[in-house]
Amino acid sequence: MITFNNQNKVYTLKTEQELPITLKKSWDFFSSPKNLFKITPEHMNFKILTDFKKMYEGQIIKYKVSPFPFFRVGWTTKITYVEEPFSFIDKQVSGPFRLWEHTHTFKKKNNKLLACDIVKYKLPLGLIGRIFGGAIVKYQLNKIFEYRNKQLNKIFNK
């Protein structure tokens, strides 16, 4: 399930997905940046520029990504919170958004894992960004998270 909300010029995306895995297995997968390749659409040309290390608070991760054809952008995030194996937060340090804060949480529910994502984001360029980019970014993020959900089902529902 993917839902969007817009309040005070900050958009919020929420998604939940049940997976037949343990907390440990979910943490091992989601806390490793190298697995982002497996759940990001190929057309985004996603590339991580930093070494893959065990996640820790304060960790900086640099990426290159193409959110739109022929448009490549650098993106730097910082891991600002880690509670293994239940939650972590990454925040944009620099990149395409005025604000990007992605909270990942994992909990057991009916002998399955419930993976929850809450992404708070603010578009650049103020009113112009919201008028011209709001619907486009919402559409893109929806497609990205739909793809991610399908890939996670393929990986873990074998």
Where are the regions a protein language model picked out?
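Short, surface-exposed coil-to-beta transition loops
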Residues: 12-14, 72-76, 99-102
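Generic structural detector for well-ordered beta-strands
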Residues: 14-20, 47, 64, 78, ...
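Beta-strand elements of well-folded, non-transmembrane domains
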Residues: 19-21, 67-69, 81, 96, ...
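A short, structured loop/turn motif at beta-sheet edges
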Residues: 22-24, 54-55, 80-87, 105-114
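Glycine-rich portal/gate segments that line the openings of hydrophobic small-molecule binding cavities
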Residues: 47-94, 147-155
